[in-house]
Amino acid sequence: MESFFNNSFATLIAYMGVITIYLLVIPLLLFYWMNNRWHVMGKYERLGIYGLVFLFFPGLILFSPFLNLRLKGSGKG
């Protein structure tokens, strides 16, 4: 019975690690990448980023209220 709890705990830790990477780590890296490279990306890089946005959409939605990727104005007006 004790090995069952050890296996369950190990499985729970593994799931938490995967969920953390999927919902937190990779979306934050993707936001950072898009924010720094948006105006200099080539077409294949942009296509790859669009694919990653599709793949990691749930994590990006979690951070969308807090991160701002709007264009910065020229400061005139």
UniProtKB/Swiss-Prot annotation:
<comment type="function">
    <text>NDH-1 shuttles electrons from an unknown electron donor, via FMN and iron-sulfur (Fe-S) centers, to quinones in the respiratory and/or the photosynthetic chain. The immediate electron acceptor for the enzyme in this species is believed to be plastoquinone. Couples the redox reaction to proton translocation, and thus conserves the redox energy in a proton gradient. Cyanobacterial NDH-1 also plays a role in inorganic carbon-concentration.</text>
</comment>
<feature type="transmembrane region" description="Helical">
    <location>
        <begin position="12"/>
        <end position="32"/>
    </location>
</feature>
<protein>
    <recommendedName>
        <fullName>NAD(P)H-quinone oxidoreductase subunit L</fullName>
        <ecNumber>7.1.1.-</ecNumber>
    </recommendedName>
</protein>
<dbReference type="GO" id="GO:0048038">
    <property type="term" value="F:quinone binding"/>
</dbReference>
<keyword id="KW-0521">NADP</keyword>
<comment type="similarity">
    <text>Belongs to the complex I NdhL subunit family.</text>
</comment>
<keyword id="KW-0472">Membrane</keyword>
<feature type="transmembrane region" description="Helical">
    <location>
        <begin position="47"/>
        <end position="67"/>
    </location>
</feature>
<dbReference type="InterPro" id="IPR019654">
    <property type="entry name" value="NADH-quinone_OxRdatse_su_L"/>
</dbReference>
<keyword id="KW-0793">Thylakoid</keyword>
<dbReference type="Pfam" id="PF10716">
    <property type="entry name" value="NdhL"/>
</dbReference>
<dbReference type="GO" id="GO:0016655">
    <property type="term" value="F:oxidoreductase activity, acting on NAD(P)H, quinone or similar compound as acceptor"/>
</dbReference>
<keyword id="KW-1133">Transmembrane helix</keyword>
<comment type="subunit">
    <text>NDH-1 can be composed of about 15 different subunits; different subcomplexes with different compositions have been identified which probably have different functions.</text>
</comment>
<keyword id="KW-0874">Quinone</keyword>
<keyword id="KW-1278">Translocase</keyword>
<keyword id="KW-0812">Transmembrane</keyword>
<keyword id="KW-0618">Plastoquinone</keyword>
<dbReference type="GO" id="GO:0031676">
    <property type="term" value="C:plasma membrane-derived thylakoid membrane"/>
</dbReference>
<keyword id="KW-0813">Transport</keyword>
<keyword id="KW-0520">NAD</keyword>
